Amino acid sequence: MHTDISSFDPALAARLRAAVDSKTKPLGALGRLESLAVQIGLIQDTEAPVLIRPAMVVFAADHGVAQAGVSAYPQAVTAQMVLNFIAGGAAVNVFCRQHGFALEIVNAGVAMPLWSLGVPGLIDAPIGAGTRNFAHEPAMTAAERDRAMALGAQRVAAHAELGSNVIALGEMGIGNTASAACLMARLCDLPLAQCVGRGAGLDDAGLARKCAVLEAALAAHADARAPLDALACFGGFEIAAMAGAMLEAARRRMVILVDGFIASAAALVATRVAPEVQRFCVFAHLSDEHGHRALLAALGAEPLLQLSMRLGEGSGAVLAYPLVVSAVAFLREMATFASAGVSEQAPPALDPAA
């Protein structure tokens, strides 16, 4: 996979910051929107960025580790949710319709043979019928990992060829918070307790079981430390596809909207493979999943929203998009002090004794 990602232009960065500062407002008054506007301009290599055909790609896959009881839901829910996505009934469907996203659902490795159902509108490209149980063996082979990453890159390329310059990535996969927690623990060198959470709603006993399974798996695969080795050992086909998608999107200078905990774990892998990917990522929100705050801190990422969400699907990425739209709009359309004839000088302070 190509990782020839171009760098940002420091001269353009200076011009963008000057353009932001010239708007009719006190310096820094638009807060996070100001740095976001500069970031989007740098991604697109222009002082006048434009957002075109935002696209959401949801990758679905099953996880062998779900057999170890690390999720509150049965594995069959993955396929059921794929059918719900196709029917238009999930949260991500609603939000994509609301905010004008093209939505694509990709079977990256669901255990149920969805091809046999003849599901219309599904990109059916499974790497396998779910990963292996990494409590006992690596989740996937290096070849399977590479195929999953290539699948993600192919889907991004397809949307780029349709004109999209904004890509959001979502996922569905029972057991994938277990994969994300192990990737985080291994690649960030953090205690598992800081990384693992309740996922889709484990009770205390279920959480204790999940922690025990994952601790044993990390110990059993102590040699899987390089980013791509860890991805093959602990990842899911959908996580690998998202990592590959992010690498391709950065190569194409697209805005990458990163959703919650699972998507951030994919971003962790992608940025460890190619650190330049980070500059193209807009981290949408702070998830309520336990490990997400520490994962964002490890990535040096500042999320746009904090809504106590923990749904996945890419839902938070779509909800954050209007802020990206507003950042671009003020950069392009807001008057400058010069064009509006407004003084840039603050008035003199009043003498309280007068």
UniProtKB/Swiss-Prot annotation:
EC numbers for this chain: 2.4.2.21
Keyword presence, Glycosyltransferase: yes
PANTHER family: NICOTINATE-NUCLEOTIDE--DIMETHYLBENZIMIDAZOLE PHOSPHORIBOSYLTRANSFERASE
GO molecular function: nicotinate-nucleotide-dimethylbenzimidazole phosphoribosyltransferase activity
Pfam families listed in its UniProt record: DBI_PRT (PF02277)
Name of the featured protein: Nicotinate-nucleotide--dimethylbenzimidazole phosphoribosyltransferase
Catalytic activity: 5,6-dimethylbenzimidazole + nicotinate beta-D-ribonucleotide = alpha-ribazole 5'-phosphate + nicotinate + H(+)
Alphabetical list of SUPFAM superfamilies matching this protein: Nicotinate mononucleotide:5,6-dimethylbenzimidazole phosphoribosyltransferase (CobT)
Family matches, as InterPro entries: Nict_dMeBzImd_PRibTrfase (IPR003200), Nict_dMeBzImd_PRibTrfase_bact (IPR017846), Nict_dMeBzImd_PRibTrfase_N (IPR023195), Nict_dMeBzImd_PRibTrfase_sf (IPR036087)
Entry keyword set: Cobalamin biosynthesis, Glycosyltransferase, Transferase
CDD domains referenced in this protein's UniProt entry, alphabetically: DMB-PRT_CobT (cd02439)
Metabolic or biological pathway, per its Swiss-Prot or TrEMBL entry: Nucleoside biosynthesis; alpha-ribazole biosynthesis; alpha-ribazole from 5,6-dimethylbenzimidazole: step 1/2
Family: Belongs to the CobT family.
Biological-process GO terms, alphabetical: cobalamin biosynthetic process
Function: Catalyzes the synthesis of alpha-ribazole-5'-phosphate from nicotinate mononucleotide (NAMN) and 5,6-dimethylbenzimidazole (DMB).
Active-site positions on this chain: E313 (proton acceptor)
